[in-house]
A protein has these predicted regions:
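Conserved acetyl-CoA-binding loop-helix of GNAT-fold acetyltransferases
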Residues: 101-115
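Extended hydrophobic secondary-structure segments that form protein cores and membrane-embedded regions
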Residues: 46-51, 90, 127-132
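Short amphipathic alpha-helix that is part of the acyltransferase structural core
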Residues: 1-40
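Conserved acyl-donor/pantetheine-binding loop and adjacent beta-alpha core of acyl/acetyltransferases
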Residues: 58-92, 155-158
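A short, internal acetyl-CoA/4′-phosphopantetheine-binding micro-motif in the GNAT/acyltransferase core
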Residues: 91-101
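Conserved active-site tyrosine of GNAT-family acetyltransferases
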Residues: 130, 140, 145
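C-terminal "cap" of GNAT-fold acetyltransferases
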Residues: 124-135, 149-176
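Conserved beta-hairpin
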Residues: 42-63
Length: 176
């Protein structure tokens, strides 16, 4: 089983041309927009998993927020103020088809969760949000993400599924 040599921010000179996760929209984003969003527009940062100098996966993160009413836990909702709450968004996540199923996506997400704890400690963060594609739903659920409040019913087939993982859950898991 290959282990990632490192997970690090995307570099301006990284070769992304040989990467394919099997999802044309994710491949197109990684090849054409990840660098622009990071280096020119400053919208997001993409982290790459590297094995033997080859990029085998990526996760793009951005600052985000979640409305209190959408936080899935009623207990947590009661403790939070009524304004938009700071969160970290997993905007994109892809693993090269040649190494899928070997834990690289989980390693990338674990890196993102550690970033969320860092964000909590530096500027505030109540959790991680993502819009999971239907085919990625079980991946995120297996890592503890739950649907945000108000989207359990009526999602059209194929629409992304908004999910949330609370910072306390993240911190406990990372300390374990």
């Amino acid at each position: 089983v290959p282990k990632t040599n490192e997970i690090r921010p995307l570099g301006k000179d990284d070769d992304r041309s040989g990467f394919s996760c099997g999802q044309p929209d994710l491949d197109r984003f990684f090849l054409h927009y990840a660098g622009q969003n990071q280096f020119k527009l400053h919208l997001a940062v993409t982290y790459v998993a590297v094995i033997e100098a080859r990029i085998v996966g990526f996760a793009t993160v951005a600052g985000s927020s979640i409305e209190r009413a959408r936080v899935p836990s009623a207990r947590l909702r009661k403790r939070l103020p009524a304004y938009p709450l700071p969160a970290l968004r997993v905007a994109r996540l892809g693993v090269d088809t040649r190494v899928q199923g070997l834990g690289i996506g989980k390693a990338l997400l674990r890196h993102v969760l550690a970033l969320a704890v860092e964000q909590r400690d530096r500027i505030g963060c109540v959790g991680v949000v993502t819009d999971a594609k239907p085919e990625a739903l079980s991946f995120y659920q297996g890592l503890g993400f739950v649907p945000v409040e108000g989207v359990r019913e009526g999602l059209l087939h194929g629409e992304p599924f908004p999910m949330f993982l609370a910072i306390d859950t993240i911190a406990s898991a990372l300390e374990a």
